[in-house]
């Protein structure tokens, strides 16, 4: 099964990892207060101490030229299976939404916080998608809240925006 590994750090530190590993497909983005790098691979990662996920559904290819929204979806052991089944079975007609580029549904190797990456041409296209029924019915906090379990046992549902780095 394909894995996705992520690490956060300073731009310079993560960029050096990327430069030193030209044979690995490493993707680096800017977030609001940090940089993030990730590697999607069937093999071993070059990242040291990354967060590891199983890729359980994928559409499209990653690109450093696209805008991404990473959605963190908390669950509990009691609700994780149902959450996963719901998200796997979602009709993926959102792929036809203007500016859509890619999608990844990720199962955590440790813990119960799932992650979704939505890739769009730019943030404006993603914000348009967020207003759609497809997003509100399947991916919004309200749509997924009954899979969170009781409060206090998990992290919060949140989004992190990842921007292309312009050099």
From Swiss-Prot:
Taxonomy, superkingdom: Bacteria
Signal peptide: none
Residues that bear Phosphohistidine: 66, 79, 154
Location in or out of the cell: Membrane
Gene3D superfamilies attached to this UniProt entry: 3.30.70.100
Domain ABM: 67-158
InterPro entries: ABM_dom, Dimeric_a/b-barrel, Heme-degrading_MO
UniProt PTM: Each of the three conserved histidine residues contributes to TRAP phosphorylation. Phosphorylation is essential for TRAP activity. Phosphorylation of TRAP is activated by RAP and necessary for the induction of RNAIII gene expression but not for ongoing transcription. TRAP is dephosphorylated from the mid-exponential phase of growth, which is when agr is activated and AIP is produced. RIP acts by inhibiting TRAP phosphorylation.
Keyword Phosphoprotein: yes
Keywords from the named record: Membrane, Phosphoprotein, Virulence
Keyword Disulfide bond found: no
Annotated Gene Ontology cellular component terms: membrane
Summary of the function given for this chain in its UniProt record: Signal transduction protein, which is a major regulator of staphylococcal pathogenesis. Phosphorylated TRAP leads to the activation of agr system and consequent RNAIII synthesis resulting in the expression of several virulence factors. Up-regulates the expression of most toxins and genes known to be necessary for biofilm formation.
Family as reported in the entry's similarity comment: Belongs to the TRAP family.
Protein name in the entry: Signal transduction protein TRAP
Gene assigned in the entry: traP
